[in-house]
């Protein structure tokens, strides 16, 4: 039995039993993947996968039990590697943070700067993407930490912690008629073309929910992942923007005005996610404590324990 066999089994499930994709992910050949799986089945005396000819079509009942053990072994192998690096170099390494564009641009800079001053030997790799990709990267070990507002609490193999609450603001050019609406109503917004985030990004769900609750259909003419892109098109007069409050800066965003909208849209909570059972280097705990001061190392360690093992 070897780790390549275990990785082949895990990746086969993750890639929907497509051996071509498994081979690409593991930098090997499709026949090589098939051989690794077959040799493991022969050694264990168990058929792990259901087959249709040479194609894998699913997991057998025994295979489902094998998969759980395989995943646990691979997590522990990664933990062992991390632990050995920890003892070899306490304050040297790379911290991989998967994060949405808005969090990377507006929420993280202060924490990253403070962390780098405290740990100059640690590189930070910011991996920006959508929340679903962030969750996937943390689950697969491609990222140590995930940060997003949407979606992270939906995965049972992730543990997530609240970092901070925030609301949306409405952004308009100077002199816009909505500036005279005090307080601003959802009905007022419904009469204007809107520019906001893509579905699944930066609290978009709460924006949509507010219009649904009011029985209104918003005229969303343009969407983007990035707050700066949204503000740019607002400045061109293409519509009214709805962005995260931390994405608007009165000094920097010349020619634009922000209108308070916390009474229109439900508040959002940015969360930080880790893979259950993962081993974190000491500096990772320091980073988390800087970005989410209310979360302690003891709390994180308790939450990271595999299901059924927490005290």
Question: Which sequence ranges carry the predicted segments?
Answer:
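N-terminal short secondary-structure element
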Residues: 1-31, 36
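A short LG(V/I)-centered, amphipathic sequence patch enriched
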Residues: 41-61
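Alpha-helical linker/hinge and terminal dimerization helices associated
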Residues: 43-44, 66-88, 287
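Central regulatory/effector-binding core of bacterial HTH transcription factors
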Residues: 92-154, 223-224
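Hydrophobic hinge/microswitch elements
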Residues: 130-143, 149, 200-259, 307
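Beta-alpha-beta core module
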Residues: 155-166, 228-277, 286
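Flexible hinge/capping segments at coil-to-helix
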Residues: 157-194
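Secondary-structure junction motif
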Residues: 178-179, 193-214, 280-289, 294-308
